[in-house]
């Protein structure tokens, strides 16, 4: 048996029904991976993923917030230099006599902060939300285009 994982799909361990380590079994320590405040029920929303890209014109932030409404999300500028994206999602719990087999939708609060560079226009920040993706655009200050300067030097002698 090889201890090196296969990156090409030839991992014999995962295909063997006789290998006890390849079976999906109950793991008594699985619940210890997260503190109780970050249980599986809330961890997806508390770990909101954000991409930050810089273009020639702006800094663009994209946050995946599946299932959230724009009313549940706040975009703020703190201290004229920090972009804060936060929100909270509540899951409506039905108290019926139904038998639940799995509950995986997440709820809870999240907050992400990003220190912005000095070359941005804080008063022109825009945010939009479409299909569970929040896009925040922070325009950059146009830098004065440097003109090529030519200075003639007198030659003495």
Curated annotation (Swiss-Prot):
<dbReference type="GO" id="GO:0071456">
    <property type="term" value="P:cellular response to hypoxia"/>
</dbReference>
<dbReference type="InterPro" id="IPR008978">
    <property type="entry name" value="HSP20-like_chaperone"/>
</dbReference>
<dbReference type="Pfam" id="PF00011">
    <property type="entry name" value="HSP20"/>
</dbReference>
<dbReference type="InterPro" id="IPR007052">
    <property type="entry name" value="CS_dom"/>
</dbReference>
<dbReference type="GO" id="GO:0009408">
    <property type="term" value="P:response to heat"/>
</dbReference>
<dbReference type="InterPro" id="IPR031107">
    <property type="entry name" value="Small_HSP"/>
</dbReference>
<comment type="subunit">
    <text>Homodimer under normal physiological conditions. Aggregates in high oligomeric complexes after heat shock. Binds to AKR2A and to chloroplasts.</text>
</comment>
<protein>
    <recommendedName>
        <fullName>17.8 kDa class I heat shock protein</fullName>
    </recommendedName>
</protein>
<feature type="domain" description="sHSP">
    <location>
        <begin position="41"/>
        <end position="156"/>
    </location>
</feature>
<comment type="similarity">
    <text>Belongs to the small heat shock protein (HSP20) family.</text>
</comment>
<comment type="function">
    <text>Cytosolic mediator for sorting and targeting of nascent chloroplast outer envelope membrane (OEM) proteins to the chloroplast. Functions as an AKR2A cofactor to facilitate the targeting of OEP7 to chloroplasts.</text>
</comment>
<keyword id="KW-0963">Cytoplasm</keyword>
<dbReference type="GO" id="GO:0005737">
    <property type="term" value="C:cytoplasm"/>
</dbReference>
<dbReference type="GO" id="GO:0006979">
    <property type="term" value="P:response to oxidative stress"/>
</dbReference>
<dbReference type="InterPro" id="IPR002068">
    <property type="entry name" value="A-crystallin/Hsp20_dom"/>
</dbReference>
<keyword id="KW-0346">Stress response</keyword>
């Amino acid at each position: 048996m090889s201890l090196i994982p296969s990156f090409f799909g030839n991992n014999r361990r995962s295909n063997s029904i006789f290998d006890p380590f390849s079976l999906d079994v109950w793991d008594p320590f699985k619940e210890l991976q997260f503190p109780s405040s970050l249980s599986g029920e809330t961890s997806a929303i508390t770990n909101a993923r954000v991409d930050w890209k810089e273009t020639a014109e702006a800094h663009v932030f994209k946050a995946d917030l599946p299932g959230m409404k724009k009313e549940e999300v706040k975009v703020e500028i703190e201290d004229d230099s920090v972009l804060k994206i936060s929100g909270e999602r509540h899951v409506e719990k039905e108290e019926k006599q139904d038998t639940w087999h799995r509950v995986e939708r997440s709820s809870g609060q999240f907050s992400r902060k990003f220190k912005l560079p000095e070359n941005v226009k804080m008063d022109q920040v825009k945010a939009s939300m479409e299909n569970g993706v929040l896009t925040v655009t922070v325009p950059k200050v146009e830098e004065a285009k440097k003109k090529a300067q030519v200075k003639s030097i007198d030659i003495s002698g």
